[in-house]
């Protein structure tokens, strides 16, 4: 069944921010931090801690320091009372801009993504299981934080235990493969019909929307620019409303698709093609 993506999701948080993780971080899970800066911003940090959300001497498996004053992002680990060797990269964020930083845990490394683009792989220097707390501090406005997800197979198919009735939203977090040609997302009816076929085609530079009823496809809809990029992450939201699905890509409305059958008769999800999935949620 479609699993809950989020272990927590918090909006407009005060800074400094401190949080105890309710569960151990598992490989495949992603921490998403979204916020904004001001023209006077100098630095801010994101830290994954062991035992306490401070720098009182306990280990810090991952320290990310965004330094506008140096034009760098500095990554490091504090272990056994000492800082290790810094890893530095040029800063892709400008002062005054909003930002989206994602940290995905793997068995051997953290995969760091900034504004939906690959930024840095940081090899673990301490066990992933030692992480218990998160802190965020510095010159930023923290809009929201969430953490969850897992490894998903593609093709992916799942039932939706609670259904997908009107007023619910399906969120899909993923990354388009660098050599992608196509991917598709299907919302399935109980009888096997497809209520919504959402099919970005890079080879045609179009996003096809359609529905399948009694083994026959209806009329294709393909208006609108391609909102996805090869090799770049995306957040896709599909909201089931009374007369149509409203579809958003990266927080911006992309299109609507008028229902062609009962909007309350959706019981399954299929995802296929040239993408990597990082999270699926219905809210």
Curated annotation (Swiss-Prot):
Signal peptide: none
Listed SMART domains: Gal-bind_lectin (SM00908), GLECT (SM00276)
Domain Galectin intervals: 17-148, 156-283
CDD domains the UniProt entry points to: GLECT
InterPro entries: ConA-like_dom_sf (IPR013320), Galectin-like (IPR044156), Galectin_CRD (IPR001079)
Keywords: Lectin, Membrane, Repeat
Cell location: Membrane
UniProt xrefs under Gene3D superfamilies: 2.60.120.200
Molecular-function annotations in GO: carbohydrate binding; galactoside binding
Annotated TM spans: none
A Pfam family of this chain: Gal-bind_lectin
A single Gene Ontology CC term: membrane
Major subcellular site: membrane
One annotated GO biological process: negative regulation of nitric oxide biosynthetic process
Membrane among keywords: yes
Binding, a beta-D-galactoside: 217-223
Assembly notes: (Microbial infection) Interacts (via domain galectin 2) with goat TMEM147. Interacts (via domain galectin 1) with goat TMEM63A.
Function comment: Binds galactose. Exerts immunomodulatory effects on host peripheral blood mononuclear cells to down-regulate host immune response. Hemagglutinates human, dog, rabbit, chicken and mouse erythrocytes but does not hemagglutinate the erythrocytes of goat, its natural host.
Record-given protein name: 32 kDa beta-galactoside-binding lectin
Provenance organism: Haemonchus contortus (Barber pole worm)
Gene that encodes the chain: GAL-1
